A protein has these predicted regions:
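Active-site gating/metal-coordination segments in enzymes
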Residues: 86, 92-221, 227
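Hydrophobic faces of well-ordered beta-strands that scaffold small-molecule active sites
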Residues: 49-53, 88-90, 130-132, 158-160, ...
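Acidic-and-aromatic substrate-binding clefts and catalytic sites of carbohydrate-active enzymes
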Residues: 66-70, 98, 136-142, 165-172, ...
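Aromatic-anchored helix/helix-loop segment that forms the rim or "lid"
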Residues: 262-291
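Catalytic metal-binding/acid-base residues of hydrolase active sites
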Residues: 54, 194-195, 244, 309
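Mid-to-C-terminal alpha-helical segments outside catalytic/metal-binding sites
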Residues: 2-47, 51, 59-87, 115-123, ...
């Protein structure tokens, strides 16, 4: 073992020891499924892998949004057991304003979030994974946190929001060094929508979470494609939330209106780029969004997600039996595709 490896190993042991001392975290036919009265029986052997599952460190509040009470790992495990979910990959909930403020305060908040998530993963290694947060508009801070998250915390991937609330979307050229590093690491990037401050008043009395949240996913993916990020870093695996939001519905219009001067970024056409992305099904298993997604994207790209705890798990699983998926497709959605992305989650069952 080289000197650098020894340092990384020692750093990780010291980190876990210090956290322990703090005590932060003590396809079947549809008719064969049961998803009533708060119960879901997975088709996949070993149960579901939930890639859209939010944690909330102590002191980080939703300001009235989401389900009541402080999140705990035990709370999630209780719900996971109830719905046949064996593993959940944790990511930060709607708290971008705490971690994207582009200051040392934001860097410190990100570190707190990631160490909390890593402690949960360490305490329950067969129940939790981690998408580490980064202070996205802060390029230097993000690069340092990526190194810490991968080399010390051993995260499964990186979680970002669809914008930084300062007028920048993920494809912004100023963020190129971050994508370069994520590409070098062949990172799995989980992208969650977050409504920017510019767009909170577009709904005339209705919450922006009613519809704007799904437009944000489309906006962010568009920025990544038209600015060549996904073209330059093909080894990055990008996961989008909520069955892609409005992306599958607008894919035809996007193809017809794609800027000709940026055709070099889509050598096989726009739809080919959209089909490469991964899509979790959280709170988007109604027949309408699912029909749009499955008309364009192959089953190899579907992932199971719940958006717990801001959303009840029932809002996702109760609709799955009515989609008429085959056993093979259900198994891919519930577990097999995630096992392919995250080989360490292939636990014996």
């Amino acid at each position: 073992m080289g000197k650098q490896e020894v340092q990384h190993s020692t750093s990780r042991r010291q980190f876990l020891k210090s956290l322990a001392a703090t005590g932060i975290c003590a396809a079947a036919p549809a008719r064969e499924l049961f998803a009533q009265k708060g119960v879901y029986k997975p088709t996949a052997k070993g149960g579901c892998i939930d890639v859209h599952h939010h944690h909330q460190p102590p002191g980080f509040t939703l300001g009235g949004r989401g389900r009541a009470g402080q999140w705990t790992p035990q709370q999630s495990i209780e719900q996971m057991d109830k719905f046949g979910i064996t593993v959940a990959i944790l990511s930060l909930t709607q708290l971008g304003d705490r971690v994207y403020d582009n200051t040392e305060k934001g860097r410190a908040a990100v570190r707190t979030v990631n160490e909390f998530g890593a402690k949960c993963m360490h305490d329950y290694p067969k129940r939790f994974g981690l998408f580490a947060s980064i202070p996205f508009p802060d390029v230097d801070g993000s690069l340092k946190e990526i190194a810490y998250a991968y080399d010390t915390l051993k995260c499964d991937g990186v979680g970002i929001y669809t914008n930084d609330n300062q007028g920048h979307w993920p494809g912004d050229p100023k963020l190129e060094p971050i994508w370069q590093e994520l590409g070098r690491r062949k990172a799995i990037v989980y992208m969650h929508p977050w409504v920017p401050s510019c767009c909170n008043n577009l709904n005339y009395g209705a919450s922006s979470f009613m519809n704007e949240i799904d437009f944000e996913t489309t906006r962010a993916v568009t920025s990544l494609i038209t600015n060549g990020v996904l073209f330059r870093y093909p080894d990055i695996k990008l996961i989008t939330a909520h069955s892609g939001g409005t992306l599958p519905v607008l894919a035809g219009r996007m193809k017809d209106r794609y800027p000709a001067e940026k055709a070099q970024y889509i050598p096989n056409g726009l739809w080919a780029e959209i089909k490469k992305l991964y899509y979790d099904c959280a709170h988007a298993t109604y027949k309408m969004p699912w029909a749009a997604l499955t008309a364009l994207v192959p089953p190899s790209q579907y992932l199971f997600g719940t958006d717990y705890s801001p959303e009840p798990i029932e809002s996702t699983v109760n609709e799955i039996p009515g989609l008429g998926m085959s056993r093979d497709v259900l198994e891919m959605l519930e577990r097999k595709n995630a096992e392919r992305l995250f080989p360490r989650l292939r636990f014996k069952v």
